[in-house]
Amino acid sequence: MRFSIRAIGKIKEKWMREGIEEYSKRLKPVVKVDVLESDEEKMPENPSAAVKGKVLEKEGEKLLRSIQDSGCVVLLDMNGKKVSSEELAAWIAQKTVMGTSHFYFMIGGPYGNGKNIQARADLKLSMGPMTFTHQMARLILFEQLYRAVKINHHEPCLLYTSPSPRDMRRS
């Protein structure tokens, strides 16, 4: 299985990068993980709806160019489906059983997602009613992917200790 994270914008805070690296390290014994960051497009001050739409389409094009047609695309979107950790784990397991091995998790920039990337999404996923920065959303996504893998392997999700690679292997 492979999780490819595609994101607009870079993680600037060291503590967020370290958190993402930690969850990535925890996932790697059982899942291939890669991240590709694309630069945000410049948004003018007080943009019209048309200008904002064009900027979002450009960012969407950047994300779409980085994926293969055969992968399953999950778009983080505030209007997406709200699921529990267990439901996300079950969805990933179901897609895997149906033959999906590559999941693309797409995170737009601070202004949202263009219609082009929304149209390509196999699942639009919401992190709930609260709003997070796109940087924080990435950290939370990594934690939830780690949790989903642990749930699907019927293993406890140890939050405050670093598991050894042995802890991540299938039983």
Feature annotation, model-predicted:
Residues 11, 78-81, 109-112:
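Short glycine-rich anion-binding loops that position phosphate/pyrophosphate groups of nucleotides
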Residues 160-171:
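Single conserved hydrophobic/aromatic residue that forms the stacking wall/gate
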Residues 1-27:
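N-terminal beta1-alpha1 ligand-phosphate binding loop
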Residues 111, 115-159:
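Structured adenosyl-cofactor binding patch, chiefly the S-adenosyl-L-methionine
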Residues 29-42:
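A short beta-strand-loop structural module common to alpha/beta enzyme folds
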